[in-house]
A protein has these predicted regions:
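DNA breakage-rejoining catalytic core of tyrosine-based enzymes
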Residues: 67-87, 140-152, 169
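C-terminal catalytic core of tyrosine-transesterase DNA break-rejoin enzymes
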Residues: 104, 208-239
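Catalytic-site neighborhood detector that most strongly recognizes the C-terminal catalytic loop/helix
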Residues: 234-255
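Active-site/catalytic core of tyrosine-dependent DNA strand-transfer enzymes
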Residues: 151-214
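Conserved tyrosine-mediated DNA breakage-rejoining catalytic core shared by Y-recombinases
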Residues: 118-157
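Alpha-helix N-cap/helix-start motif at helix boundaries, enriched for small hydrophobics
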Residues: 102-103, 114-119, 231
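N-terminal core-binding DNA-recognition domain of tyrosine recombinases/integrases
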Residues: 1-73
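Basic, Lys/Arg- and aromatic-enriched nucleic-acid-binding interface segment
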Residues: 82-113
Length: 255
């Protein structure tokens, strides 16, 4: 609302629409919770100072008054089961094969959604099964570069997507990169609803990769700490605690 420059002009539907947009973009529960708390603090302060009348409707009603449910920052290391991920992709592929391909990239490489849509042919080394991300060029979080090692079983897939990128002047595998993430998110929501699968958003596919990477490392002889740290590095983190908190549930770990 660029036309709104004064706090007294902020309406409840604006506040609710802003929070709903954060939800649609799959922002973290912690961030959404902080935004909601800030809006309610603003509401209280404006009533105390007389900017809002005492009888004015709340900027952001609580759930008991018909508002949005609360959000918290506690991470959940819950992924789609491999068969769930495949069902979602199969549902989407018939109506939006491009979105389905993005999800396949996330599932098989662990890339974040923006990293996936900005992936280029020149980032993929099929012979070594390594994807090299160059920070801002690949839209990595914080602009940090990293390498992701992919299972040799995925060589046919890597060859396929690399060939797609090689047909484009920039090497990018996907077009419409600015709008594509939101499109993919919407398709995932529709698929999960239709298939009655608990929706974990697009990030659930990254978690599916993380769970499989941890399992592969354990099967290759790594201990729990080594497998956790390797998975964190693959995902673009540098602490095993991140994997423990957000990616690999306790029941799937070897302690």
């Amino acid at each position: 609302w660029p036309e709104v420059s004064e706090v007294e002009d902020v309406e409840p539907d604006m506040a609710q629409a802003y929070v709903e947009e954060l939800i649609r973009r799959e922002r973290s529960g912690g961030r959404i919770g902080r935004v909601m708390a800030s809006l309610r603090k603003l509401d209280r302060a404006c009533r105390i100072t007389g900017v809002f009348g005492k009888d004015a409707p709340p900027l952001l009603p609580y759930i008991t008054d018909g508002g949005l449910s609360g959000f918290h920052s506690e991470p959940r290391p819950v992924a789609y089961f491999p068969e769930q991920a495949e069902r979602i992709i199969e549902w989407i592929i018939n109506i939006d094969p491009i979105s389905a391909r993005v999800l396949h990239v996330m599932q098989k490489t662990g890339l974040r959604i923006r990293e996936a849509v900005y992936l280029r042919a020149q980032d993929i080394d099929v012979a070594t099964c390594i994807i090299t991300l160059e920070g801002d060029v690949n839209h990595t979080k914080g602009g940090r570069p990293r390498e992701v090692r992919i299972s040799p079983e995925e060589i046919p897939f890597l060859s396929e997507i690399k060939a797609i990128g090689e047909k484009n002047p920039t090497g990018h595998i996907f077009h419409d990169r600015g709008s594509l993430p939101d499109r993919v998110r919407e398709q995932v929501r529709k698929a999960c609803k239709a298939l009655r699968i608990p929706c974990l958003g697009t990030h659930g596919f990254r978690k599916t990769f993380a769970a499989q990477n941890y399992k592969n490392r354990i099967e290759a002889g790594a201990d729990d700490d080594q497998a956790l740290l390797d998975t964190s590095i693959q995902l673009g983190h540098n602490r095993k605690d991140v994997t423990i908190q957000s990616y690999v549930p306790p029941q799937d770990r070897r302690n």
